[in-house]
Amino acid sequence: MHEPMKTLKNIHAEIRICQKFPKSTVQKRFSEFEELIKAASKNARNWKPISSVELFQGDSSLNELFEKLVIGTCELRDGELFENVNDLTINPSNIHVYKLHKDGPLSQNIGDDDGDESIIGSQLWQLPCVEFDSIWENLIYDSNLKNEVMSYVAALARLSEKHVNTKIINVNRLILLTGPPGTGKTSLCKGLAQHLSIRMNDKYSKSVMLEINSHSLFSKWFSESGKLVQKMFDQIDELAEDEKCMVFVLIDEVESLGMCRESSSSRSEPSDAIRAVNALLTQIDRIRRRDNVLILCTSNLESTLDKALVDRADIVKNVGQPSDFARYSMLKSSIMELARIGVVIDNEVHTDYWPQDICDTKAPRNEFTEILFKIAQEARGLSGRAISMLPTLVYSKSPEETITLPNCMNLFLEAVKERLSRNN
């Protein structure tokens, strides 16, 4: 049975252009470009890159302009085909043209009042950047997590643009992702910031991410940690003074700064740790007046976080361990990447027999899809991070420069078992 045709209201196109071309060159050809998107849409997947060969079909004048194209909407599942979309019309305001920054991060120093010492408190990234490229589309979750987070943050941004009265409608612009280590929380934050910097580049001429080293904010000097937290947020406030600059703040492992004060008191923790929590909460309240600041926090230990910090979060999402289907997709992506660079190769295997995209249990599967799905089931207990490390282990086990597809499957199964035994 065919799925009913869908009508989508909010489709976005992200176009990365070559450094040597100005944006105006591309903008003049939007209408021509939109027709090509419609023609290629049947094979396009939500938030997945479209092949330039497939898109431009030999038009070298267009092909040389573009490095990457992604189309997507929060109305479809991540990776879902656009083949059942009724009308793939993209509003010109939803076509986002961008270039990547290649300068790398800049270390930001903070120090004690006497100026005798300074420590690296954060890394400053210009967005969108090379280092965060492709993070978003390569994050695989079973739930609609990516769309939910993106939709919520977009709603926060729209409310901020309308200058909502925050005394009536509480908007803190604070996102908290929780879950066990290795599930992609930090990567999701970086991918989200990259994605939003592209989507909002018509409003903000510049976007930056300040990645805070929360461990460095604990001074060796008693009672200084609260002051260091304040100094860090002074830097954030200074960046946000430019209303044309979107500032993303990433606080990884926020439990280092935001541990529950009640439990700290009961365990006779140093009062400096409690001062740091107080300072963090005060600075979050202070920075909320800035419409162009979004704070992204991750935590491996949600139960240890101070309740006042969790309560300030606009949205709290748990990022769990991947399911069988998510692990399968990760393994398949790894194999296809190894095939792309010429490591996995098998001329005797027809294209139709390579592992397939599977969205549900009813999808018909070929032989290698079945084998890989069994490997994914065997890999229960491995995090996304652990799975992403398997290809190197697989390649190290091969005596040859290239690996046949059947042998690749055997090596992946061996690598999964080895990694599981290491975890146990």
UniProtKB/Swiss-Prot annotation:
<dbReference type="Pfam" id="PF22107">
    <property type="entry name" value="Pch2_N"/>
</dbReference>
<dbReference type="GO" id="GO:0007131">
    <property type="term" value="P:reciprocal meiotic recombination"/>
</dbReference>
<keyword id="KW-0067">ATP-binding</keyword>
<comment type="similarity">
    <text>Belongs to the AAA ATPase family. PCH2 subfamily.</text>
</comment>
<dbReference type="InterPro" id="IPR054330">
    <property type="entry name" value="Pch2-like_N"/>
</dbReference>
<keyword id="KW-0469">Meiosis</keyword>
<dbReference type="GO" id="GO:0016887">
    <property type="term" value="F:ATP hydrolysis activity"/>
</dbReference>
<dbReference type="InterPro" id="IPR003959">
    <property type="entry name" value="ATPase_AAA_core"/>
</dbReference>
<dbReference type="GO" id="GO:0005634">
    <property type="term" value="C:nucleus"/>
</dbReference>
<keyword id="KW-0547">Nucleotide-binding</keyword>
<feature type="binding site">
    <location>
        <begin position="179"/>
        <end position="186"/>
    </location>
    <ligand>
        <name>ATP</name>
    </ligand>
</feature>
<dbReference type="GO" id="GO:0005694">
    <property type="term" value="C:chromosome"/>
</dbReference>
<dbReference type="GO" id="GO:0000776">
    <property type="term" value="C:kinetochore"/>
</dbReference>
<comment type="function">
    <text>Plays a key role in chromosome recombination during meiosis.</text>
</comment>
<dbReference type="InterPro" id="IPR003593">
    <property type="entry name" value="AAA+_ATPase"/>
</dbReference>
<dbReference type="InterPro" id="IPR044539">
    <property type="entry name" value="Pch2-like"/>
</dbReference>
<dbReference type="InterPro" id="IPR003960">
    <property type="entry name" value="ATPase_AAA_CS"/>
</dbReference>
<dbReference type="GO" id="GO:0051598">
    <property type="term" value="P:meiotic recombination checkpoint signaling"/>
</dbReference>
<dbReference type="Pfam" id="PF00004">
    <property type="entry name" value="AAA"/>
</dbReference>
<dbReference type="InterPro" id="IPR001270">
    <property type="entry name" value="ClpA/B"/>
</dbReference>
<dbReference type="GO" id="GO:0005524">
    <property type="term" value="F:ATP binding"/>
</dbReference>
<dbReference type="Pfam" id="PF23242">
    <property type="entry name" value="AAA_lid_TRIP13_C"/>
</dbReference>
<protein>
    <recommendedName>
        <fullName>Putative pachytene checkpoint protein 2</fullName>
    </recommendedName>
</protein>
<dbReference type="InterPro" id="IPR027417">
    <property type="entry name" value="P-loop_NTPase"/>
</dbReference>
